[in-house]
Amino acid sequence: KDPDRKTWHGVFTTSGNGVQLKNGRIMFVLNVRKSDKVSPLYNHVLYTDDGGKTWNVSKGAPGISKNPTRGGSEAKIVELNDGTLLMAIRPEGIYQRFLAKSTDNGETWDVAEPRGDLPSSSSNGDIIYYTSTLNGWDKNRIITMFDSVPYTASTPPGNPKLYWSYDEGKTWKGFLIHTGNAGYSSLAILNDGSIGILAEIGGSWNGPI
């Protein structure tokens, strides 16, 4: 039924966490190839409003500023206090994380911009909304983690860093979690309020985790 999707050549879902919005919508990010070329990849949203009985795909995906021929992939989403969605995108070719926003529950997105304060390898990471003033906390805290070493033919990804933002993604600070080769990572808020980190450590991506 969708003339655009009829031309898609390949789709896979980003590994790791999805997100549930305050209105109940559950969503994951799809990585879409719209031609027979490897890149660019486009980040459309797969979402359900009925607990998974039916699924829809967003009309739009973020354009990628300064790197349109390579794009980005394996994005993750958090919901900001005003309902705006923030998408963090794995970069391809430009080693800075890309951020984009949506104000219509993920149906359309603005252009994703690279962030100089989020140096990033081309590797999957995660982002979570850790604490919100809407829930009685003293600060808004968004946490993200990913590898910071550029991923090239001669340099594997590594040196994962944990970053935090107190102003809903406007500015970021971070620190090194591990020195050396590393792969994908995922974050979770544990029952005691601490942050759980699941990460691939080493250059083979076969363990340990």
Where are these regions (language model features)?
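Asp-box/BNR beta-propeller blade signature and adjacent active/binding-site loops
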Residues: 1-209
